[in-house]
Amino acid sequence: MIILGCFVLLGSALPLTAQLIWQGLEKQHPPKVLDRLGSYDAVVVLSGMLSGFSYKGTFRSEWADPDRFFAGIEVLKSGKTSTLIFTRGLLPWGNSKAEGEILKIKAIEMGVNETQIILSDTVYNTAEEARAVKELMEENGIDKI
């Protein structure tokens, strides 16, 4: 029984197992087609898509899972919203800028007007992101996200 338990534990720790579980979950909720989206006051892009490393004493960020960033830009450029909200998720690696600040720079580089971007306060997890977005909605008169 112990040997079987070890195999189950090792098997569930494999990256392949995690990938299969994620695929199963995401298959049930595919991304919406842009043409089928309605209009929104803002689109929210949550943090958690950058990773980072230190190089010669400075922090460098790199994409880990950028699909939500590019989807937010696409929704904005389609005219379905006029505002992007980025959350300032704090990256746990070194002394880096909050993720929302990095994403804002990247969005501006892609042609988004700075006035169309709102940043939340610094947040450390998804629950804090939700509260920060709610506050921004109230402060900016945003009803539909």
Regions picked out by a protein language model, each given a short descriptive name:
Residues 11-145:
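A structural signal for short, hydrophobic/glycine-enriched beta-strand patches
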